[in-house]
Amino acid sequence: MKKYLIMFVALLALVGQANAQRCLPKMKGIELKANMADGFHTSDKDNSAGYSFGAALSSYTKGGNKWVFGAEYLQWHSPYKDICIPVSQFTAEGGYYYKFLSDARKIVFFYIGASALAGYETVNWGDKLLFDGATLHARDRFVYGGAITLDMEIYIADRIALLANIRERCLWGGDTKKFHTQYGLGIKFIIN
């Protein structure tokens, strides 16, 4: 009887759900994101809000922190009379994100990160002459700066996570706005 009791207790110790090991050092993931910039983008001609799309490679370090390297396309609009003049930025990013909160089951993670950004800004796709004969004085230029990001990951499977983020970008060197607030959603695929 004692033998069966020990076996029963051993079996009970093995019952339960095993959680996946997430955010281990050297794990890598591919992130795809879509954001709104400076408000909510609509077709209204007085709306200067825009949107952005990005892709990044994230590599985890000790403690679940991560390095992020990626590229992003951001477009916003500058209202002028009855039209909106497009301003586009193509940027590369490199940054470090610190995990400051996660749940015990390692499903939800919160990060705060800082990134360096560099890229190119184009106003009206380089076309200086407007429909009414006015000339744009803003030029296409290289831009540089940084971003601060608050990021959330929610794992829906062992290798798939949903992302939500809010970030503030500041870029110098261009002839247009320096600061852009972005918020959006994304998805991450763990690749190793």
What is each residue range found by the language model?
Residues 13-19:
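C-terminal segment of classical bacterial N-terminal signal peptides
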Residues 26-30, 47-53, 84-92, 108, ...:
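Residues that define the transmembrane beta-barrel architecture of outer-membrane proteins
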Residues 40-43, 79-85, 132-138, 170-174:
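Extracellular loop and loop/strand-boundary signature of outer-membrane beta-barrel proteins
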Residues 56-131, 189-192:
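Gram-negative (and chloroplast) outer-membrane scaffold detector with strong preference
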